[in-house]
Amino acid sequence: IMIIGEAPGANEDKQGEPFVGRGGKLLDDMLKMIGLDRSRLYITNSVKCRPPENRDPMNTEKDACKGYLQRQRALMQPKIIVCLGRVSAMEIIRPDFKISQEHGQFFEKDGCLMMALYHPAALLRDPRKKPETFEDLKRLQGNGTLFAHKTARKGLVIPAGHVPAQVPV
């Protein structure tokens, strides 16, 4: 699993590692709740440099970092990519991605299964989104991921909440 965020925040910029601030702590806690350990995942950002004043990355910044992200993906060869936030999802899944409508859905692209979740910073700003994000995360574990791998087709969307309790192997 490869997790791709948007861009470094102040803490990440200081420490040179993604998701180390409050958002990183929340991400770690959420991953633990579904039995995933951060040390077994590859976590990066689509933009490698911190945009001033925490603004969304500009197209020129995204374009400047595209090659780095492509090389990371080529080296890691992830089976699953989780985009954290709108900016990452629009960069990785498709430019018109709507995080409020499409979070938690699996998409197949370039032989890789992809899903977008609300960014941890968005969850800190609006804690009411945490339960639905946790439900989205649960789809990454166990039968949900197995089901998605078996049924995803190029361009096919598997809606959130559409995972049977048991999937025969």
Show which residues each predicted segment covers:
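A polyanion-binding, active-site-adjacent surface
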Residues: 1-169
